[in-house]
């Protein structure tokens, strides 16, 4: 399949410190950015943010991996973030971020909601 349209992809994970999920996030970011797509990552930050940005990725700090009652507010922040940035695809890379993304996407109008993987 050939994509002529440039898309905006959001990857969501708890943090960008070290590990397989984090490395995979950077690899996907690098590949998609090299093809001209806009890639965004939402996490609580970490030492790999600099590498992400050097590969043309954009990072936004949001505590999507924190297990507490305030995660409800994170859902609403993510809804606004997705709408504002016109996200086409959301890729959740961990369990808690997946639930946060699931609830956020279900609050968005079905005609405007991104693909969730």
Describe every region a protein language model picked out.
Residues 9, 105-117:
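Active-site proximal beta-strand in glycosyltransferases
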Residues 52, 101-105:
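Hydrophobic packing residues within well-ordered alpha-helices of enzyme cores
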Residues 81-88:
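Glycine-rich phosphate-binding loop signature in dinucleotide/nucleotide-binding domains
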Residues 88-89, 115:
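Short, Asp-centered acidic motifs that coordinate Mg2+ and/or phosphate
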Residues 92-98:
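Short His-centered aromatic/hydrophobic patch
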Residues 75-79:
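Short hydrophobic/charged patches on amphipathic alpha-helices used for structural packing
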Residues 2-3:
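Short, flexible hinge/linker loops that cap or flank conserved catalytic cores
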Residues 6-7, 11-73:
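N-terminal strand-loop element at the rim of the active site
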């Amino acid at each position: 399949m050939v994509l002529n349209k440039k898309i905006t992809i959001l990857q969501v994970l708890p943090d960008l410190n070290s590990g397989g999920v984090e490395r995979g996030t950077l690899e996907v970011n690098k590949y998609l950015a090299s093809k001209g797509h806009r890639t965004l990552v939402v996490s609580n930050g970490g030492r790999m943010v600099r590498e992400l940005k050097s590969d043309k990725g954009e990072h936004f700090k949001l505590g999507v991996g924190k297990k507490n009652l305030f995660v409800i507010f994170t859902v609403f922040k993510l809804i606004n973030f997705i709408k504002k940035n016109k996200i086409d695809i959301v890729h959740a890379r961990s369990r808690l971020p997946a639930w946060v993304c699931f609830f956020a996407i279900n609050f968005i109008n079905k005609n405007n909601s991104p693909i969730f993987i």
